[in-house]
Amino acid sequence: AIVEVKVPXLXE
């Protein structure tokens, strides 16, 4: 997802 690429931390 684009959001994961911009904010890796969010994904985690």
From Swiss-Prot:
Transmembrane segments: none annotated. Its EC number is 2.3.1.61. Binds 1 lipoyl cofactor covalently. Residues 1-12 form the Lipoyl-binding domain. GO terms for biological process: L-lysine catabolic process to acetyl-CoA via saccharopine; tricarboxylic acid cycle. Induction: By 2,4-dichlorophenol. One of its GO terms (molecular function) is dihydrolipoyllysine-residue succinyltransferase activity. The keyword Oxidoreductase does not apply. Keywords: Acyltransferase, Lipoyl, Transferase, Tricarboxylic acid cycle. Pathway: Amino-acid degradation; L-lysine degradation via saccharopine pathway; glutaryl-CoA from L-lysine: step 6/6. Its cofactor is (R)-lipoate. It catalyses: N(6)-[(R)-dihydrolipoyl]-L-lysyl-[protein] + succinyl-CoA = N(6)-[(R)-S(8)-succinyldihydrolipoyl]-L-lysyl-[protein] + CoA. E2 component of the 2-oxoglutarate dehydrogenase (OGDH) complex which catalyzes the second step in the conversion of 2-oxoglutarate to succinyl-CoA and CO(2). Forms a 24-polypeptide structural core with octahedral symmetry. Part of the 2-oxoglutarate dehydrogenase (OGDH) complex composed of E1 (2-oxoglutarate dehydrogenase), E2 (dihydrolipoamide succinyltransferase) and E3 (dihydrolipoamide dehydrogenase); the complex contains multiple copies of the three enzymatic components (E1, E2 and E3). Belongs to the 2-oxoacid dehydrogenase family. This is Dihydrolipoyllysine-residue succinyltransferase component of 2-oxoglutarate dehydrogenase complex. It comes from Delftia acidovorans. The lineage of its organism: Bacteria, Pseudomonadati, Pseudomonadota, Betaproteobacteria, Burkholderiales.
